[in-house]
C-alpha cells in the first residue's frame, strides 16, 4: 500500500537553529554544531517557522515511511546533542587480571589503549572519534566516561571499546571480563 503523503514534525527548542540545504542538516546550539548528510534518503523538509520543521514523504511505501521516522529521530538526537550532550559511563570487569586502560596519542590521533586483558601481552587500541572526550572517573574505581554532542560517535566509541574486549573461545557465562556500558545519560541533567 502506498501512502499519498506522510508527515512528521520536528520541534526546535529555544536557542537552537536548524538549517537545511539540499538535505544536509546543520544544527547549531549552545554546546556546538552538528552536521548530517541525508541526501541518500528521499524526504522533503519544510521549515514552517523557527520552532517547527515538517518532514514529508510523498507516495512512499512502508519502508520509505519508516525512513521518514528515522530522519526525525536523527534530527531529534542532533538537537538533544547540541543542548544537553550525551554521556556514557563504562566499567572494567575482571576476576583475576586487572585491566589497564590509558589514553595515548599517536601521530596526532588519540587512542584508548587496553592492556592486560585476561593477562594477554597484546595491546588493544581503539581510536577515539572526533568530538568525543574521554576521562577517567575520580570517585568510582575502574570507570571511564565518554561524552560528546553526537550520540552516534559516543555510542560507537563505547561499542568499539566493548567489542575489542570480547572473550573468545571460552564460556562467556564464566569469563565475564570486559569493559561494559554501565550508564547512558546526558551531560547536563534536567533538574
UniProtKB/Swiss-Prot annotation:
The keyword Ribonucleoprotein applies. This is Large ribosomal subunit protein uL6A. One of its GO terms (biological process) is cytoplasmic translation. Component of the large ribosomal subunit (LSU). Mature yeast ribosomes consist of a small (40S) and a large (60S) subunit. The 40S small subunit contains 1 molecule of ribosomal RNA (18S rRNA) and 33 different proteins (encoded by 57 genes). The large 60S subunit contains 3 rRNA molecules (25S, 5.8S and 5S rRNA) and 46 different proteins (encoded by 81 genes). uL6 lines the binding pocket for eukaryotic elongation factor 2 (eEF2). Its main location: cytoplasm. It holds the Pfam family Ribosomal_L6. Transmembrane segments: none annotated. SUPFAM superfamilies: Ribosomal protein L6. GO terms for cellular component: cytosol; cytosolic large ribosomal subunit. Coiled coil: none annotated. Keywords: Cytoplasm, Ribonucleoprotein, Ribosomal protein. PANTHER family: 60S RIBOSOMAL PROTEIN L9 (PTHR11655:SF16), 60S/50S RIBOSOMAL PROTEIN L6/L9 (PTHR11655). The keyword Ribosomal protein applies.
Amino acid at each position: 500500500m502506498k501512502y499519498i503523503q506522510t508527515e512528521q514534525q520536528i520541534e526546535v527548542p529555544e536557542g537552537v537553529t536548524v538549517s537545511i540545504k539540499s538535505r544536509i542538516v546543520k544544527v547549531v546550539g549552545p554546546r556546538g554544531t552538528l552536521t548530517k548528510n541525508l541526501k541518500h534518503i528521499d524526504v522533503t523538509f519544510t521549515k514552517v517557522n523557527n520552532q517547527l520543521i515538517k518532514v514529508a514523504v510523498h507516495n512512499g511505501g512502508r519502508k520509505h515511511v519508516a525512513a521518514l521516522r528515522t530522519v526525525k529521530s536523527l534530527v531529534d538526537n542532533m538537537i538533544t546533542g547540541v543542548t544537553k550532550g550525551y554521556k556514557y559511563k563504562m566499567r572494567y570487569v575482571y576476576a583475576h587480571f586487572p585491566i589497564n586502560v590509558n589514553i595515548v596519542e599517536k601521530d596526532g590521533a588519540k587512542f584508548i589503549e587496553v592492556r592486560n586483558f585476561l593477562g594477554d601481552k597484546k595491546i588493544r587500541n581503539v581510536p577515539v572519534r572526533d568530538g568525543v572526550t574521554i576521562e577517567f572517573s575520580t570517585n568510582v574505581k575502574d570507570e571511564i566516561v565518554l561524552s560528546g554532542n553526537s550520540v552516534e560517535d559516543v555510542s560507537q566509541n563505547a561499542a568499539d571499546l566493548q567489542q575489542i574486549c570480547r572473550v573468545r573461545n571460552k564460556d562467556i557465562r564464566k569469563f565475564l571480563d570486559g569493559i561494559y556500558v554501565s550508564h547512558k545519560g546526558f551531560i547536563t541533567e534536567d533538574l
